[in-house]
């Protein structure tokens, strides 16, 4: 029985392929037939204007013509010298007698009977070509889906039968609270009488809200898998097309199909593509989206009962959804699926490690502590990258070193070992990263330094990587001020030790300025401006979100002055710390020049005044380098908030 589904899918795929080939062959056959008919019609011999009838009769009289074939008014003349030509007879009744008198052989042929099919193709051929081309374009716009050009109103929802869906709650880890919120749906789908006897009504719609990659789709499939009911899956963008009314028709068709399979689950991924609040835009496309949303509102809670169909939707933009969509009776329950904590990350890692041969030295709890901020998708990618590292090294199992290398690659980008840079540029990068690391170690509330490297990775020439000791859910003023000082440690080290400035600190400045601005304008952390919000407000308008200024020019000048004060104070703090600890910066720079990468143990040795021990798997100074001047100073996009990624040029 396990082979029946793959075999059925293979037969279905083969049948679809054969149908597609047959349709293409039929189209090209029609085109070829029409073209052949047209060319044949135009291929008939035409009368030549170069020889007149009078000249032809003179040639016949002078014995220059041997034969004439008469076919209607067309005369095919065969001269004694030269090639045949055709002329049109003017209707001379004495012509045949004269030709025979001149000794010309005359033959007659009946006119060709007109072929009705050929004439029909000749006159209707262009119209047929236009119709065939129109059908072809309609199928192309529909992606070759079932039904062709007349399937616009058909739902694109994909039905996953209860016997095909093998996902259960055991496959979902790291979101125990979210699973508890939806377990009632499973009980209702298994035994609806239990709730109906007491007059209870199960939520008709559940909205899963959370960042990307946290397992919203997986949780919806697990609900259907646990309840053993059919599962319809569709994306919000599949409803709206270029033709008016298609979206509403697809919504109706989807719910009609779902009611036939009830009890069942309809899962709409990225519902914000069709469920955005109405009135925030203009134009035909916006009207079509609103019609689709209106139809969805009616289907979920209108005059007609929708018993047995539970709608589960997922989005990471719940703030843009229409209020009518979120009211009780439609999506009356919102379940937040957030980033997993350290325990959740450990559970997720163990789920994904089931499919990978793991070494005895691998500890999921240690990996979980070193991956704060990772989503479930990130952790799945981490396990996959570790397996790829092990495969490249021809290992039989995936060990802890493979996970460390995979984590470094995801956090900081892939190594660019082939990049070669001059010695002075490597040293400038080493001073820059040492400045970040030393300032981070000297500030009391900063996150511990996990690794420092001048090995080029991704867009960065060097990275100072900090990891928090535990998950953080809020920040305090002291933490944010220290974060700004750490960001300025790189530029301050360049000034103190090299008496120079590079473009490598540009990303540091962007992030430091943003933190300082948020402290003043959003979080009320300014003593002079007080606990007020000074950011521009946003409101819904005809063209979407519109922002308006809420502060005067004089107040804005005070805001800018306060941001400047915070920046200057933290830059001065970073510079003072480096000047007071020159020996530590020099020692760390020398260690980076020798090994290119040092970890937390070597950093602690240097800060304690001890010679740094050689790191495990130390790399020589010639194993890589930095990019030449002129490279982009932008940090890698996958660097976490606690990583310092800089490019020194």
Swiss-Prot record:
GO terms for biological process: protein catabolic process; proteolysis. Its EC number is 3.4.24.-. The chain crosses the membrane at residues 19-39, 116-136. Keywords: ATP-binding, Cell inner membrane, Cell membrane, Hydrolase, Membrane, Metal-binding, Metalloprotease, Nucleotide-binding, Protease, Transmembrane, Transmembrane helix, Zinc. It is an enzyme of class 3 (hydrolase). Residues 1-18, 137-649 are cytoplasmic. Signal peptide: none annotated. It is a multi-pass membrane protein. Binds 1 zinc ion per subunit. It holds the Pfam family Peptidase_M41. Zn(2+) binds at residues 432, 436, 508. Its main location: membrane. Residues 606-649 are annotated as: Disordered. In the central section; belongs to the AAA ATPase family. In the C-terminal section; belongs to the peptidase M41 family. This is ATP-dependent zinc metalloprotease FtsH.
């Amino acid at each position: 029985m396990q082979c029946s589904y793959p075999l059925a899918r293979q037969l279905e795929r083969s049948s679809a392929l054969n149908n597609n080939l047959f349709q293409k062959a039929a189209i090209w056959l029609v085109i070829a037939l029409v073209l052949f008919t047209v060319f044949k019609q135009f291929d008939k011999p035409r009368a030549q204007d170069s020889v007149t009838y009078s000249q032809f009769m003179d040639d016949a009289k002078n014995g220059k013509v041997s034969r004439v074939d008469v076919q209607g008014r067309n005369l095919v003349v065969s001269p004694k010298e030269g090639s045949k030509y055709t002329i049109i007879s003017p209707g001379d009744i004495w012509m045949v007698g004269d030709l025979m008198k001149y000794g010309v052989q005359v033959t007659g042929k009946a006119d060709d009977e007109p072929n009705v099919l050929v004439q029909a193709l000749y006159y209707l051929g262009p119209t047929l070509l236009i119709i065939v081309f129109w059908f072809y374009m309609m199928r192309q716009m529909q992606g070759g889906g079932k039904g062709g050009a007349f399937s616009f109103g058909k739902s694109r929802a994909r039905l996953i039968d209860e016997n095909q869906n093998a996902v259960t709650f055991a496959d979902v880890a790291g979101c125990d609270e979210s699973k508890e919120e939806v377990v009632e749906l499973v009980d209702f789908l298994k035994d609806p009488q239990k709730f109906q006897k007491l007059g209870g009504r199960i939520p008709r719609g559940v909205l899963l809200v959370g960042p990307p990659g946290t397992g919203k789709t997986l949780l919806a499939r697990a609900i259907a898998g646990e309840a053993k009911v059919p599962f319809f899956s569709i994306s919000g963008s599949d409803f709206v097309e270029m033709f008016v009314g298609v979206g509403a028709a697809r919504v109706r068709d989807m719910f009609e199909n779902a009611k036939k399979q009830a009890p069942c689950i309809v899962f709409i991924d990225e519902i914000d593509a069709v469920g955005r609040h109405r009135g925030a835009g203009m134009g035909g496309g916006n009207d079509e989206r609103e019609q689709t949303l209106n139809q969805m509102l009616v289907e979920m809670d209108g005059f007609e009962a929708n018993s047995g169909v539970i709608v589960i939707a997922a989005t990471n933009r719940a703030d843009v959804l229409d209020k009518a969509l979120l009211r009780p009776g439609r999506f009356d329950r919102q379940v937040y699926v957030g980033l997993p904590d350290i325990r959740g990350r450990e559970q997720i890692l163990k789920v994904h490690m089931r499919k990978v041969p793991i070494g005895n030295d691998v500890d999921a709890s240690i990996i979980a502590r070193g991956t704060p901020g990772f989503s479930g998708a990130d952790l799945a990618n981490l396990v996959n990258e570790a397996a790829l590292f092990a495969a490249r090294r021809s290992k039989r199992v995936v060990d802890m070193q493979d996970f460390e290398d995979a984590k470094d690659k995801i956090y900081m980008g892939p190594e660019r070992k082939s990049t070669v840079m001059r010695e002075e540029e490597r040293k400038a990068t080493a001073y820059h990263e040492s400045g970040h690391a030393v300032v981070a170690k000297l500030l009391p509330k900063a996150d511990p330094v996990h690794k420092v490297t001048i090995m080029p990775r991704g867009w960065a020439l060097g990275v100072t990587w900090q990891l928090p000791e535990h998950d953080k859910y809020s920040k305090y003023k002291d933490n944010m001020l220290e974060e700004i000082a750490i960001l300025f440690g790189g530029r301050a080290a360049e000034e103190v030790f090299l008496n120079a400035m590079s473009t490598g600190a540009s990303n540091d400045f962007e992030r430091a300025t943003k933190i300082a601005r948020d402290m003043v304008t959003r979080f009320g952390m300014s003593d002079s401006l007080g606990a007020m919000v000074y950011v521009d407000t946003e409101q819904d308008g005809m063209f979407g979100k519109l922002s308006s200024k809420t502060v005067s020019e004089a107040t804005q000048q005070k805001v800018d002055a306060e941001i400047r004060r915070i920046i200057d104070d933290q830059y001065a703090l970073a510079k003072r710390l480096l000047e007071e600890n020159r020996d530590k910066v020099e020692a760390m720079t020398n260690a980076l020049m020798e090994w290119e990468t040092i970890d937390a143990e070597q950093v602690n040795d240097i800060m304690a005044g001890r010679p740094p021990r050689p790191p495990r798997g130390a790399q020589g100074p010639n194993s890589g380098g930095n990019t030449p001047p002129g490279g982009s100073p932008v940090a890698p996009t996958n660097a976490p908030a606690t990583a310092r990624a800089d490019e020194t040029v």
